């Protein structure tokens, strides 16, 4: 799908989405985006389980991208595995920064203390950008009540900088 087609698609879908449930939005998106070109990005946090459950109902093999920052607790990783098994998710892909980037940029593993933005870019943003290159769209768990900057989030939007369709079924 070309960028201009994506933009038109986003406008058209937002016009009809106000009548749809979150599950219906996921199912519709799953049908419309080419197989293998849609992913869910999830933290596997408590609120994220709702979205993971909805996705599992539509397609348990949909790629689910989980960012391992290498700073997560063992319990967090174990919880991610338990939730995946419980929901029957079969295509969870753990993404992380490349080891050589850690060694070069954050050799002591303390960048989060001195430059949180650089740490976030190294451990979250860069790996996510790399992983999303394979996809035309991605599902996000953003909600309108999560702050003033998200108060007007639409069900479908173009992800600036990535030229991907971003689907927000829980807005």
Located regions from the model:
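Nucleotide-activated chemistry modules centered on ATP-dependent adenylation/adenylyltransferase
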Residues: 1-171
């Amino acid at each position: 799908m070309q960028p201009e087609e994506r933009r038109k698609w986003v406008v058209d879908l937002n016009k009809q989405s106000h009548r749809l449930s979150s599950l219906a939005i996921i199912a519709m998106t799953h049908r419309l985006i080419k197989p293998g070109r849609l992913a869910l990005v999830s933290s596997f946090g408590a609120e994220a389980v709702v979205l993971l459950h909805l996705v599992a109902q539509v397609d348990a093999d949909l790629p689910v991208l989980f960012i391992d920052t290498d700073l997560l607790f063992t319990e967090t990783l174990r919880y991610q595995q338990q939730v995946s098994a419980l929901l029957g998710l079969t295509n969870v892909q753990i993404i992380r920064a490349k080891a050589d980037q850690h060694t070069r940029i954050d050799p002591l593993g303390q960048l989060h203390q001195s430059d949180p933005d650089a740490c976030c870019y190294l451990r979250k943003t860069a790996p996510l950008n790399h992983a999303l290159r394979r996809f035309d769209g991605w599902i996000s768990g953003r909600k309108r009540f999560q702050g003033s900057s998200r108060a007007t989030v639409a069900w479908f939007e173009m992800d600036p900088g990535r030229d991907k369709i971003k689907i927000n079924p829980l807005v």
